[in-house]
Amino acid sequence: MKLSKVRTAEEIIARFKDGQIIAIGGQTNQYMPDRLIDCVLESGARHLTIYSIDSSDPGHGVSLLVEAGRVDAMITTHVGTNPLTNAKIQSGALKAEFNPMGTFIERIRCGGAGLGGVLTKTGLGTVVEEGKQIIEVNGESYLLETCLLYTSPSP
């Protein structure tokens, strides 16, 4: 018997719990899974860690979760278009880890592929390097960027 991948909103809402890590696709306000974000809000889940390219513009996408106080931490590439997210980060109300976009995507891919991480030159000699392991391969230095898992602790 073939199982359907289609779920009702109620079934989806029931899956969200406090403290979960949720990866959300889209960028700025484009291709955001708006109904999924509505389901997260309707679930009442709090203390979430969000993996997203950005935090969207105010009143849209991921920003709705930040505005509702549901997000404790984000792993992202930037939040430059959202003054509320920036203010929450500056005040310490929201933890954030920033990654170059390609590195961010590669970390998610590595998690899904069961890999421990990726070696990259991106970020060497910058603030991105701080606190990360540098590995030498064939005389070249690389940053080890660990994979992003959906069971890893918040940053």
Q: For each predicted feature, which ranges?
A:
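An acidic, phosphate/nucleotide-engaging active-site surface
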Residues: P83-L149
